[in-house]
Amino acid sequence: MAEVRLGENETIESALRRFKKKIQKAGILPEVRRREHYEKPSQRRKRKLEASRRRRR
């Protein structure tokens, strides 16, 4: 879990920027979006196969 502690004389905006950067680096946001709805196992296999094809090109 990404955690950001507010430093002395640090604005909320800068702490929020650091938090967003940590979230993006950890890859949490895409994971949350992917898990938003149930994905059937066949759809998951199809998505992974397409991703591997794109990587091979």
From Swiss-Prot:
Pfam families: Ribosomal_S21. Keywords: Ribonucleoprotein, Ribosomal protein. One of its GO terms (biological process) is translation. InterPro entries: Ribosomal_bS21 (IPR001911), Ribosomal_bS21_CS (IPR018278), Ribosomal_bS21_sf (IPR038380). GO terms for cellular component: ribonucleoprotein complex; ribosome. Gene3D superfamilies: Ribosomal protein S8 (1.20.5.1150). Residues 43-57 have a biased composition (Basic residues). Residues 32-57 are annotated as: Disordered. Residues 32-42 have a biased composition (Basic and acidic residues). One of its GO terms (molecular function) is structural constituent of ribosome. The keyword Mitochondrion does not apply. It comes from the Bacteria. PANTHER family: MITOCHONDRIAL 28S RIBOSOMAL PROTEIN S21, SMALL RIBOSOMAL SUBUNIT PROTEIN BS21. Belongs to the bacterial ribosomal protein bS21 family. This is Small ribosomal subunit protein bS21. It comes from Synechococcus elongatus (strain ATCC 33912 / PCC 7942 / FACHB-805) (Anacystis nidulans R2). The lineage of its organism: Bacteria, Bacillati, Cyanobacteriota, Cyanophyceae, Synechococcales.
